């Protein structure tokens, strides 16, 4: 922990504008995450720190700590992916959207942390109707930003091994992005991509 704090202090001393933590579930270790957040909250700096978190597992003690964070000191990226609980279970994410939403709303009420909520198009079992509902569910929360990604079937991943089962067609070139599935067509994915690019 001392070594980590020395590293963070280096960024602070150099007046780095943004530091991104690449751990996709930064707060899965309560003791570790609260120690880091406490240190960064108390630091004298304008550096912003970006974390990818699992909002549904935020504890009351963490929320209370985060209330003390200077405005814009932290930004959180929350991987919603879909609000369809059946699809979440299919991709081995055993969490309900209602639990994510509850904590995201609590963070929004604090008004000092910018939140990015991520959606993924092309998930197995999610058709265009389900995706639209996912988007509307997330939009209704009014986060600062919604980010849309398209499913990537990386080599060695369990989802790639199940590609045939769900009729998932994907590019043969890295990063192996989804082209179509049994549930969502190529044209529908292309429309989503164009709408996202030109509608931003």
Placement of each model-derived feature along the sequence:
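Residues in well-ordered alpha-helical elements
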Residues: 1-2, 98, 129-132
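Hydrophobic side chains in well-ordered alpha-helices
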Residues: 100-103, 134, 192
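Catalytic cores of alpha/beta
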Residues: 61-66, 124-142
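Alpha-helix boundary/capping residues
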Residues: 11, 70, 138, 196-199
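Flexible glycine/acidic-rich beta-alpha junction loops that bind and position SAM and/or redox cofactors
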Residues: 30-31, 86-91, 124-129, 142-189, ...
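Short, hinge-like loop/turn segments at secondary-structure boundaries
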Residues: 37-38, 134, 163-167
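Conserved SAM/AdoMet-binding glycine-rich loop
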Residues: 3-124
């Amino acid at each position: 922990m001392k070594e980590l704090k020395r590293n963070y202090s280096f960024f602070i001393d150099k007046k780095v504008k943004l530091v991104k933590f690449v751990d996709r579930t930064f707060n899965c270790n309560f003791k570790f995450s609260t120690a880091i957040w406490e240190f960064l909250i108390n630091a004298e700096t304008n550096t912003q720190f970006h974390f990818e978190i699992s909002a549904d597992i935020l504890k009351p003690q963490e929320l209370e700590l985060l209330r003390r964070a200077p405005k814009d000191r932290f930004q959180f990226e929350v991987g919603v992916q879909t609000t369809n609980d059946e699809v979440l279970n299919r991709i081995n994410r055993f969490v309900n959207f209602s639990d994510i939403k509850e904590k995201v709303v609590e963070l929004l009420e604090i008004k000092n942390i910018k939140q990015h909520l991520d959606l993924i198009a092309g998930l197995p079992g999610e058709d265009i109707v389900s995706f639209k509902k996912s988007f509307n569910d997330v939009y209704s929360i009014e986060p600062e930003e919604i980010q849309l990604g398209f499913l990537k079937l990386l080599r060695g991943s369990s989802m790639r091994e199940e590609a045939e089962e769900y009729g998932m067609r994907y590019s043969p070139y890295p990063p192996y992005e989804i082209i179509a599935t049994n549930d969502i067509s190529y044209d529908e994915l292309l429309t989503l991509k164009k709408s996202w690019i030109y509608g931003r």
